[in-house]
UniProtKB/Swiss-Prot annotation:
Residues binding ATP: F59, V60, G61, G62, T63, G64, K65, T66
One Gene Ontology molecular-function label: tetraacyldisaccharide 4'-kinase activity
Keyword Lipid metabolism assigned: yes
Keywords: ATP-binding, Kinase, Lipid A biosynthesis, Lipid biosynthesis, Lipid metabolism, Nucleotide-binding, Transferase
Enzyme class: transferase
Gene this chain is encoded by: lpxK
Family: Belongs to the LpxK family.
Pathway named in the protein's UniProt entry: Glycolipid biosynthesis; lipid IV(A) biosynthesis; lipid IV(A) from (3R)-3-hydroxytetradecanoyl-[acyl-carrier-protein] and UDP-N-acetyl-alpha-D-glucosamine: step 6/6
Protein name: Tetraacyldisaccharide 4'-kinase
GO biological process entries: lipid A biosynthetic process; lipopolysaccharide core region biosynthetic process
Gene Ontology CC annotations of this record: plasma membrane
EC number: 2.7.1.130
């Protein structure tokens, strides 16, 4: 989804949220019961001989997980580990699951975020609805630790470390479960995870946070010169098919661009005509969109890469948690 219903974010909850509270209570109860079943062993988890780090959320839509997953994978590699990344592959339409993701994979087959991670980290990446089966492909590739991009609610996947990413601006919305609010699980689920990390400072929610730092613009065309992108002050068409497009538009405005926003649904399968806006103004899109649009976008098109940068105390705690993975067992 590109934008959430406004009443999901309104505190205190308004009449629409209250009207849906019975359904939200039912949904939340089912999620609690399902998790309890896994904890008690009534529903069997998969088994993996290596530690698993789950990076997920309880808020629907984008919270900035994928850049943090890339940072975690890079950090593990710098520690001498052999990380692999597993993902559901949202948006992918492959007929064969699970499957490995290569740098030249078709995003329509494997999904945009897994392809972005494969290209950005150089780590083995595997996708599939059954993340345990996908993780087995990573073991065959020699990985000694698995990082799951999303999957907090995929309880069949065992985990040694659970990290939840929240949006520092939207927080937990109105604090209610679907369909009355934006939460995939009740808010008290956060008390059971190893670390809650906010994308942007949110002291009322957690002391741990990171920021997304934009890099220099890069052209979509492979044969284009890396320099020559639009200067700040230029009016640009901004394209974002992510969970929270407004955040991308605000980033461009913060860099000095005059933005004509074009929000699309998350994981949107673009067609060429959707990226032509009837003028010769430059187009800037997210890196996640760029992996799908290299052959579709107009000539004057760029993407804005971002990387996660944990603040010092958060970085220290994350590194300490990752360093002791060898002593942790999956649960």
């Amino acid at each position: 989804m590109s934008e959430l219903p406004a009443f999901w974010l309104r505190r205190p909850p308004d009449w629409r949220a209250h009207a849906l509270r019975p359904l939200a209570a039912l949904y939340g109860g089912v999620m609690r019961l399902r998790r309890y079943g896994y904890r008690k062993g009534w529903i069997r988890r998969g088994r993996l001989p290596v530690p698993v780090v789950v990076v997920g959320n309880i808020f629907v839509g984008g919270t900035g997980k994928t850049p943090l997953v890339a940072w975690i994978a890079d950090t593990l590699a710098a520690m001498g580990r052999r990380p692999g990344i597993v993902s559901r592959g949202y948006g992918g339409r492959s007929r064969e699951w699970p499957r490995r993701v290569a740098a030249d994979s078709d995003p329509a087959e494997v999904g945009d975020e897994p392809l972005l991670l494969a290209r950005g980290t150089g780590c083995p990446v595997a996708v599939g609805p059954d993340r345990v089966a996908a993780a087995q492909l990573l073991l065959a590739a020699g990985c000694d630790v698995v990082v799951s991009d999303d999957g907090l609610q995929h309880y069949r996947l065992p985990r040694a470390l659970e990290l939840v990413v929240c949006d520092g601006h939207r927080g937990l919305g109105n604090g209610l479960c679907l369909p009355a609010g934006p939460l995939r699980e009740p808010a008290d689920r956060l008390a059971d995870v190893d670390m809650v990390i906010s994308n942007g400072r949110a002291p009322a929610l957690t002391p741990w946070w990171f920021e997304l730092v934009p890099g220099p613009l890069r052209p979509l065309a492979a044969d284009a010169a890396p320099e020559g992108g639009p200067e700040p002050g230029t009016t640009v068409h901004a394209v974002a098919g992510i969970g929270h497009p407004a955040r991308f538009f605000a980033t461009l405005e913060g860099l000095g661009y005059r933005v004509i926003p074009h929000p699309f649904p998350d994981h949107h399968p673009y067609r060429a005509g959707e990226l032509r806006f009837g003028d010769d103004r430059p187009v800037i899109m997210t890196e996640k969109d760029a992996v799908k649009c290299a052959g579709l976008a107009p000539a004057r098109s760029w993407f804005l890469p971002v990387e996660a940068r944990p603040e010092p105390a958060t970085r220290e705690r994350l590194e300490a948690s990752l360093a002791r993975l060898h002593s942790l067992t999956n649960r």
